[in-house]
Amino acid sequence: MPKEVIERYRNSVPEEVIQIWEEYGLGSFLNGYLRVINPDDYKELVEETYFSGKESIPLFTTAFADVITWENNKYIGIIFYREEDFDIMASGIKYFFYDIYNEREFTDDYFDLKLYEKAVKKYGELEYNQSFCFFHY
């Protein structure tokens, strides 16, 4: 993660996010399903497509092109672009990370990990800047 990005968002995102950026930079976790992103790469998209976009900071994306945001300096939100929906996932980053690794119901509610595993098996692992997408005929 570029140092200027870290400094720009240092007082706007949780310290845990700053630590991830400083220690690991860009990358993925949850077997590649979630990606750590540069907020600047998604800020314009979120501002133009999400009613709360100007107050939201993009933090992560999913393998299905959903965007996870930091909202109102206290919530983790998710924008489900393929479903044209959004939700608040957690009240704080600590709860978000705890729930990802400890609450099956949480991941079932917000992430389609089974579909992701099937897609990876059929099409292979994604590159960092790729997502699985759905086409309506």
Model-derived segments and spans:
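A surface-exposed partner-binding patch
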Residues: 1-78, 130-137
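A sequence-composition feature that detects small, non-aromatic residues
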Residues: 63-65, 90, 119
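Compact, glycine/acidic-enriched structural inserts
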Residues: 77-115
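Generic surface-pattern signal
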Residues: 7, 11, 22, 26, ...
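Context-gated lysine
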Residues: 3, 43, 54, 74, ...
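Low-complexity intrinsically disordered segments
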Residues: 1, 111-137
